[in-house]
């Protein structure tokens, strides 16, 4: 079994395109808080109504591809990642300083992340994304549903070459620490 993190499909495509280098996590509805189940994982793509309103306009070209990866019948797993750094947000008022590192609107981050369980801190994951050599189609099952961060998949795909270098992501991690860490 392989660990997979549920992540919005648009973000997975942004990671693969090199537009995004971070994830913003607080945990699912059925979790008290986000915990890192593994430092290397696949992405299980998800989709939600209102995706377009959550993504900045300059990234709307990702939405058609993203929607096709997460349907009622199946998901297409096309990427994985390694965590370079996990940084708790100590200065949420400074999140705009790292907006260039992700595709989400400021309103989406506030509503979907900061206002959800406001006593719990948001975590920024700096990740090194990898495309899979061949995408894997998985039938959607009942155990994939629900508001949890992690699922186990019975797949062992071959990983391709990382999107970003280690040194580039070390600079991203430093920028995140300086901007919002605490």
Q: Can you name each region flagged by the protein language model?
A:
Residues 1-182:
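Structured alpha/beta reader/binder surfaces that contact nucleic acids or chromatin modification marks
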């Amino acid at each position: 079994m392989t660990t997979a993190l549920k992540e919005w499909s648009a973000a997975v495509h942004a990671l693969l395109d090199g537009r995004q280098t971070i994830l913003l996590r607080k945990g699912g509805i059925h979790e008290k808080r986000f915990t890192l189940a593994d430092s290397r994982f696949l992405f299980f793509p998800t989709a939600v109504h209102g995706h377009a309103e959550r993504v900045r306009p300059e990234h709307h070209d990702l939405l058609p591809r993203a929607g096709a990866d997460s349907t009622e019948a199946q998901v297409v797993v096309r990427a994985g990642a390694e965590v370079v750094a996990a940084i708790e947000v100590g200065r949420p008022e400074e999140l705009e300083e790292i907006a260039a590192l992700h595709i989400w609107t400021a309103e989406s981050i506030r509503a979907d992340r900061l206002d959800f369980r406001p006593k719990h801190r948001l975590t920024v994951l700096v990740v090194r994304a990898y495309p899979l050599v061949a995408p894997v189609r998985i039938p959607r099952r009942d155990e994939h549903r629900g508001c949890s961060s992690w699922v186990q998949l019975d797949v062992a795909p071959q990983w391709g070459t990382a999107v970003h270098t280690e040194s580039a992501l070390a600079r991203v991690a430093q920028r995140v620490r300086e901007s919002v860490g605490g």
